[in-house]
Amino acid sequence: MTGRCLIKYSFTPMMTGSQVRRRFLDFFISKGHKEVHSSSLVPANDPTLLFTNAGMNQFKDVFLGVEKRDYNRATTSQKCVRAGGKHNDLENVGFTNRHHTFFEMLGNFSFGDYFKKDAIAYAWELVTSPDWYGMQQDKLYATIFKGENGVPRDDEAYQLWLDVGVPKERVFEMGMKDNFWAMGDTGPCGPCSELHYDMGVASSDKKNPECAAGECKFPCECGRYVEIWNLVFMQFDRDASGTLNPLPKPSIDTGAGLERVTAVMQGVVSNYDTDLFTPLIKRAAELTDVDEKREEAKESQSKSAASLRVIADHSRAATFLISDGVIPANEGRGYVLRKIIRRGIRHGRLLGQNKPFLHDMVYAVRDLMQDAYPELKETADRVAKTVLAEETRFANTLDIGLKKLDEDLASLAETTRELGRLSWEEPKPVEFALKEVARHVFVVAQMLSPGMTFDTPGHGFLLRRGIYRAWMDLKAVGLDRVVRLSEIAEALSEGETGRVQSVAKNLAHTKQILDAEQERLQSASSQLEFELDAMEAEKKLAENPEMLAEQVREVFGPALEEKVINELRGKLQSRPVYSGDKAFKLYDTFGLPLDFMVDAARDQGIEFDQAGFDAAMESQRETARASWKGGSKLSASPIYRELAEELGTKPYPGQLAGGHPMITPQSIFVGYTSTEFKGATVLAIISNGASVAQLAPGDVAEMVLDYTPFYSESGGQIGDTGWLYDSTGNTVVAEVETVQSPVQGVRAHKVTARQNIAVGDKLNAVVNADVRRATMRNHTGTHLLHAALREVLGKHVKQAGSLVDPAKLRFDFSHFTGVADEELQDIEDIVNKEVLKNDRVEVIENVPIDVAVNEYKAMALFGEKYGDRVRVIKIGDFSTELCGGTHTLATGEIGLIKVLHEGSVSSGVRRLEAVTGENSVRHFRKDHELEGVVSTIVRPSEGLSPAQALKFELDRREEEIKKLRKELEQSRMKSASSAVSSATESAREVKGIKVLATRADNIDRNQMRTLIDNLRSKLGSGVIVLGSVQDGKVALIVGVTKDLTSKIQAGKIIAQVAKHVGGSGGGRPDMAEAGGKDPAALDGALNATYGIVDSLLS
């Protein structure tokens, strides 16, 4: 099957993806549905979801009965992401035809209005009518719930499908796994029906000859039969005991994947071959310099084709996630976004594109999807800059991660160097290779016995070729750095035959040649092929190597073979393992791909701890889940939802337009215009997650009142504090610490009781007015700052979070670089001019959301959930936002706004902190006091403010300190160099090699390396071990001159020396480093060096 498989259907001409989306919405509008715009990918006020992953998410509270809309039929095309948590399609994306991280879910919904009959009739009409989709009826299959686990079969749906015209042989029964839906362990649930389309050909690996021949039957899972629509019939309410109780108003929730429906309408097997993706794949091919047409002619599962699909998909997900306010981070949603971006970058690298490119894909996504999602026109530049920043960051961290991986693997390989790629569980290929090594070494030893060299005509080629083949066979099993060829020659020399004895007589010369050539091969392996090609010309002079091979076989007895194999096998007993935890840190921190690390470890013969990696990954996922599930807010435990249902509903005092009351639990906020309410009734008391009847003095609990002036924490503004008085208003019965809304409409007051309080008591609620006023100043100031930031920095600035309390305001916003001091000054000047204008802060209640956004041009705040009607805060012509918080009556009440700090929160997100009112005055008073102190330290310079004069003096002194520090380091280096150089005279000879072990304290590693190089030059040939103590830590460096690395390696020396100071280390044969924890043991470690070298040489 080729990459693009076309199937000719009768419904032509081909419908575009945009037309498929629009036609779905128009069909349901014609059936009395309201078109509702897609909600954000960041679920509002739903801690159970990482991302919006279904069309019904934005209607969840409507289905649960805690929210009322002014329509009971809706249709949407909902943006969805499944790349984390329960629904995680990330690893499959690009390698299958229908997995995506970002997708659109077409849906129609009924909130207690029509039910199964109309839902099934609508679905069938839309997909089969020539006026709409016009799919071939004989290609469609329906499924129903067959009945399972005590839940009856959905006979009604079965009959309804027959009634609309589906033959009974194409209506199939499925179990609870496929055809029963539930919102959770308890709550709304019900059977569902699916529509599947026969694509005519299999499209997955799960196929047999019947599938390949197109003879398989529904519901074969080979990919031939594609689910295009799921109709959920919410007709039950499952209680805690598992009993299914009929819902008084059954509802409908359907979902049809736009990408799948479009594939059917365009006659292609793969979603990636639809016009929803092909422009993106084409752009990805251009940016990665891949011949996309050539790849299309190949198998669709080719690596290049898969990588292009990954880039196309991930660019969609990244564009929409960032557009909706998600920023790359190391936890929660930001972490998933970072993984998506980095996976896209990695697949670009697999295609040979190592430069930033993914940010360019953002504009391709915008051009393709801006008609359906016009917000992309405004956000594209911001999104592209965020992706580019992440690409740059990833490139930097990748280099650091690769270096760290090399260090980790080198440290492991120092103990047992590069163990075999072939496992000892497969002895035959390993033993065969080892025997070949021994055979080649024996042949070389025989040739060297008469004094032959590499310069000997003809035979010189055979000699070098024989060593090369021995080395390559050794390398094939990963032992080229474990075993010396000279060791094998020595083992071969211990035999009884005359030929073996002849090898023994010339063993020293043989070992010297083998060591030198192996060292050359190790260090210059990249040039080998060139060198060997140059030697091909000498082949005609060579003697027949087969003759020597026959002689080897005559004398190569089983005992000797076994001896060599056993010797090598003994070196393989402790196979090193690369820690999965370490690998995950590189994956998580530096973005190193898992398969890259596995391959790198395997290439060096090191086992990879996959189980440890998986455990670390799962631990991180748990942390990520926790990071987005909640914070300081009260958990929405079942008690609050039960309370909302128990309390019933009550019309809000200000009814909505058209006479529709806002249905909400009996917990009404009346604090916009007053900070007191007399006669509030205690509706419920919650203590430790359970409902209680009363509180005693000192008890801490949450209390729900029917009417309250206390603002509940929302939109970044903290909850009010204050007091609850008895009905006389004279006695405080409880202190209110904060107020939160665990479920919509229920305002839970966290209180500490001073008197006995019982459910049903009448109390007077009084907000701390001073704290409220300070909070209001900061909240209105936040709106002014938001508008000023957009004016100074650009319209890409959007709120990314906020905190408003009485002491200060904190505002997080999208921006890519630090805000310059001059820009901060401009922002501060602009907002204070608005304060001085004393403009009225206009509050406009119950505005239809579309009017607020399109006519008032109100800005919606990040992460907030809005209903059909909203509250607009308008400050002159300067700022208009959707906001439910409390505000000053006019800007003049703010007094003064002072910006305290601006800094980075994460990539692409900045944070600004400021104070208003009395706190601004306090800040200026502190500044004035500081200026007085500065004037006593720094002599004021002409034209400089005290702050500027202080900065000038600090900069001057910092430069002076840097100069003195440099002079001190140079002095230390000079002193250490002099002392160490004089110590060369005390170098000892160990088995004919000069060895110097000395210390030079209070110098850094770079200086130590310089000393090592100087000492090696001075000694000419030898081993140097240098130790140093600085800041209570031991540093060790070993240097071996090049001429000695075949006999003794720096890494082996340092491994043993470091043990004496409680450390470890590794490195190259000529240079190795280590650290240690025991400074007192350094002298002993250096003294032990000579014995260690002697032992290693033995």
Curated annotation (Swiss-Prot):
It is an enzyme of class 6 (ligase). PROSITE patterns: AA_TRNA_LIGASE_II_ALA. One of its GO terms (biological process) is negative regulation of DNA-templated transcription. Binds 1 zinc ion per subunit. Pfam families: DHHA1 (PF02272), tRNA-synt_2c (PF01411), tRNA_SAD (PF07973). It comes from the Bacteria. Zn(2+) binds at H779, H783, C883, H887. It catalyses: tRNA(Ala) + L-alanine + ATP = L-alanyl-tRNA(Ala) + AMP + diphosphate. Keywords: Aminoacyl-tRNA synthetase, ATP-binding, Cytoplasm, Ligase, Metal-binding, Nucleotide-binding, Protein biosynthesis, RNA-binding, tRNA-binding, Zinc. InterPro entries: aa-tRNA-synth_II/BPL/LPL, Ala-tRNA-lgiase_IIc, Ala-tRNA-ligase_IIc_anticod-bd, Ala-tRNA-synth_IIc_core, Ala-tRNA-synth_IIc_N, Ala-tRNA_ligase, Ala_tRNA_ligase_euk/bac, DHHA1_dom. Its main location: cytoplasm. Its cofactor is Zn(2+). Its EC number is 6.1.1.7. The keyword RNA-binding applies. It is found in: Cytoplasm. GO terms for cellular component: cytosol. GO terms for molecular function: alanine-tRNA ligase activity; aminoacyl-tRNA deacylase activity; ATP binding; tRNA binding; zinc ion binding. NCBIfam families: alaS (TIGR00344). Catalyzes the attachment of alanine to tRNA(Ala) in a two-step reaction: alanine is first activated by ATP to form Ala-AMP and then transferred to the acceptor end of tRNA(Ala). Also edits incorrectly charged Ser-tRNA(Ala) and Gly-tRNA(Ala) via its editing domain. Consists of three domains; the N-terminal catalytic domain, the editing domain and the C-terminal C-Ala domain. The editing domain removes incorrectly charged amino acids, while the C-Ala domain, along with tRNA(Ala), serves as a bridge to cooperatively bring together the editing and aminoacylation centers thus stimulating deacylation of misacylated tRNAs. Belongs to the class-II aminoacyl-tRNA synthetase family. This is Alanine--tRNA ligase. It comes from Koribacter versatilis (strain Ellin345).
